[in-house]
Amino acid sequence: MRFRIVSSKKGKVCSLPCEACYQPHISKIVTSILQGKPVSFVLPAFPGKSPNPSKVLGTLPDMAERYSLVFLNDLCKSIEKIYPPGAHILICSDGRVFSDIIGMKDADITAYQREIDAIITRLDLTNLSTFNLDQLYTGQDFDCMRQELLDVFGQPIALLKEKVRRGANEYASREDREANRMYSGITKFLFEDALFPGQLKSRNEIQKDAKVRAYGVIQRSNAWSNLIAGQFPEHVRLSIHPQTCGDLKLGIRLSAESRITPWHGVALDIGGAITLVKRHEAEKLAAQLINDENGRPDYYKL
């Protein structure tokens, strides 16, 4: 639970250890232990790089992704110290699910997914593997994949809007509060991603557009989550987003020092210690840009 991220309500955060937080997951963990198998986790993450060049270096994974993948693999390795079979994290790349809504090219998603797999192989990160929409809906074009996902696992936008509205109420259900919280978070990310040099819209126009697109992203994201739950029912469910006490998912960091995800930032080497920041923040510090062995921008160094 050290790297867990929790969403607090009115400033209150559950204490650890917390029985309510363990309850949704303990039976899956116990089952794995009784069978002598690694504890399996599933994490929707690593969708593809943000389209905002003020946040990232490009469209392909760089040191930021490598750092986070090693972090997750090391986390699994640390479990081996107390439970020898250890743990395994299945990364469910969700970029294909909503790329057309957030301005990511499908070709870039394909290249990103392939490079993530290559990194896992190259660095021998044996506690990690990946799953994506392409593996499930083979032989279809990307638009058909997304539509089939919605047809089978999606819910109407109108229903989602009602949940978000109810979630703003102090006495809302856990599910409605989660919908409202997720809507606010996704709207913020979409707003930030659209604020880049050269764009011509006003901040007010960008905010309105982000609010509309956020519903589509959440609709797709929820459908992907439902698919994953059905495909991998024995896996403990993780999330890159903060989760409230007793939720069906555990929120988790992707690095020890930062809440920024690698696809929304860059790696910054500060005297040998790596942290994740947004590109413009690294440049504001006058950090030196370091290229990889192929001459591609990779990370910043102070």
Model-derived features with residue positions:
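Charge-rich, solvent-exposed alpha-helical interaction surfaces
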Residues: 29, 71-78, 115, 119, ...
